[in-house]
Amino acid sequence: MMHLLIRSARIFTLVLLSSAFALGQQAPSSNASQSPATQVQTAAPPTGFSSSTAANPQSNNGLAQPGFLTPIYGLQGVLAETLDGATVAAQSIDEKFNPASSIKLATTLVALQSFGPEHRFLTSVWVTGTIDRTNGTLTGDLIVTGRDPSFHYEHAVLLARELNQLGIRTVNGNLIVAPGFTMNFDWSAKHSGEEFLNTFDAARRSGNATRAWIDERTLVSDNESLRSVPSVVITGQVQIGSAPTGAIPLLTHKSSKLVDVLKVLLCYSNNFMAERIGESLGGPQAVRAVLVDKLKINPDEILMSSTSGLGVNRFTPRAMMKILRALRDELQKNRLSLSDILPVAGIDPGTLEDRYTDPLERGSVIAKTGTLVRTDGGASSLVGQMKTKSGRVVLFVILNQRGNVVHFRQNQDGIVTAIQNSLGGPAPFDYLPIRLSMRLADSDKEAARARGEYEPRNQ
């Protein structure tokens, strides 16, 4: 079955993303404290917003807006608000829950604030020694540095092509990769370096890497690159280290824009990419510090042990709502919207692909999911926005734990649907989908030679 899924380069990349998502949802059990103590109770569905059913934001325990909530076994926190801040539903909003992968919204917010949506991750190639262009040989080492969380097969082949255009086809030396370099979602710099070396050499290149290269070049209509087979043979070994003194920068590869990397990350809830970006921000405690400082979130409302949502983390629904609103504001400052980074239910591939798929619901929910099957006895979340036929957009946070995650998801969908129906029913957001493979095949991502810093010279 896998060979069918990876018949195209981009499909292969997205399969990796999906696989990482599926594996990442499992986490070790934890008996951590700070678990909420409220259990959901039975309530009848509402007919709409009225004075008799208006939420009471002061009632944080129990059902402040009972009509939107249905019976469920487990713990639940809910906060739904209109854009102007009116409370639609509130339950246990100051209790702490495990948000699972919804914590990626916090990582995303701080990344956008720190780097900006146009930011590109750089992967640089350095060399030592001399180049003999008469026989295409570099006598010296090739060094690769960078922390691009989206670096894959096709990017390595692209760099091989650029070296070929500089007259290099053989490296009589070692491949040195920086400790922070990773490729194909592999945390090990050593393994990533070995994959890079094999992908560089056409004779050792895997079928997956070959398809990745062909499909991406086809996707961006770069037929010229397909007329030859890029290849660089490295005769030495893979070593881990920094660029040595005297190394000369030769090429720099630019990733897709951060906003496009985030869209893929969040659609597939890719834990590896979230942790890599989190590392570049200083780790979970650095992200938490920004939330406390800039968003004025009470430090007692958030506990972060990861930037992906793996493990034991704690957020209150109130804190998560502040993050969601800040994320919308940050995007709007850059003329973007939540649909530019989050999955649109029933349309985008990934975690919301099979939810809200009814023709009347499709495209009416934009949200981040979260799932941990074992941690905290099972944790599930849904955080985002919904649109209704009344024209209202409602922001919502639903956090569940200590129960069956499948039932939690069904309950979350029921809450969203009930709120939408109370406002005339669901309505789709304006959204023009772009294939995720195209987002990662940004044509501006070409390797650029370092002008004025290196001139090939004969040995």
Placement of each model-derived feature along the sequence:
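Bacterial N-terminal signal peptides
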Residues: 10-20
